[in-house]
Amino acid sequence: MAIGQYTSDLEPGDILGPVEYTLSPFVVREYCHANELHQPFFQGRQDEIVMPPTLIHLDKLRLYKHACPKGTGPSARIHYEYDCTVHEAVKVGARLSVSGTVRERFTKRGREHIVVEMELRSADDGRLLIAYRDTVLVAFKPAGGAA
């Protein structure tokens, strides 16, 4: 397990979370402002604001912070690709629970990859709101060299 270590130490089968929190309008508005998402359903009236699907990237960081408090490790990670399936809109003020599982770790062309699958659920009734699969490059190891 990577608990208490670096994100670069994650191995298949490691469980991240669950972490519970309440989605705040401030986080949604600031994220949307930074990403130039100016549509009213992201930055309008508070009772109408929904979470943009890509905001789940912050949940991955939330899980890393709890499971791997030492940070990224000797090699920074690069967000490589992701797939996000939204099952239901997530409104501001919702109580949420996010959890993840490390599914794969592999090397391709000298680059180490880690695949994490996450689920964002309603903390009230367990409904699946968003399913997310993320692949990050953890390190590059040149032939015969260190990362």
Model-derived regions: residue spans:
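Hot-dog-fold acyl-thioester-processing enzymes
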Residues: 1-81, 143-147
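HotDog/MaoC-like acyl-thioester-processing domains
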Residues: 1-7, 86-147
